[in-house]
Amino acid sequence: CCNSRIIVCFSSTNDPTDPWYIYSLTGNPLNNNRWTDFPAIALSETGLVITANLIIPNVSWQVGFDGSVIWHLNTSEGFAGGNVNATVYTQIAHNGKFVRNLHPVRGHDNISDQLQFLSNRNFDLQNDTIFLITLTEGTSDTTVTAQALISNVPYGVPPNGKQGDTDTTDATKGLQTNDGRVLGAIQKDGWIQFVSTTAHGANANAGIYHGFIANAQSPDPKLT
C-alpha cells in the first residue's frame, strides 16, 4: 500500500507528441498504512481536483473504506511545469461519519463554475440524504464545506441486475451492481443534475436515480 500513487500528467503544448509534465501524489497521504482507490476528476478555471477513497490493506474495498479525500492542484502551474501546490483535504464527514465516494460535479462544458462534489449513503437499503460538498478556491485559502440535502424520493442500494438467464430465486445471481453511489453529475446556470443506481419497485429491480439540485451554489440549495 505504501507504493500506491496517483500519477497526474499535464501537456506542455496542444501537441500530444511534445513533452509532458508528470506529477506523483502519494496514495497514503495521512501516512497511516492506507492505499488509494477509485479516483475521479473535475476542472475549474484554475484548479484540478482529484477525489479518491482511502482503503485499509488486506481487506475488501467494501469494508476497508477509511475516508474519502480531495486533492487540489493549480492547473496554471501544472501546464507550465511548475509547483502545482498539491493540497489534500481529508476527514470529510457528516455527523461524525465519513462521507464516502465523493463524485466531482463537472461543468456542462467540462469546466466547473464552482468545484462541488456529491455523495450518498450508497450501501443503505433506503435513505433520503444527498451530501453536497463545496470547495471554494481563494487566493490565500481554500475551504471545504458539506451540506446534507433531503430528497422527496428515497434511494437504496440496488439488487443485482436481472438478465434473461438470471435465476431470480437467488439474489447473488445476475449482473453485480456493487452499490448505489453517485456516478455522474453536471452543473450549469446554478443547477446540478446527477445520477446513480438505486433499488426500484420494492427493491425487486435495479434502476436509475436522477436528481436535480436547484440553486446549488447558494446558501440554500434545493434537491428534488
Predicted regions and their residues:
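C-terminal PAP-associated
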Residues: 1-224
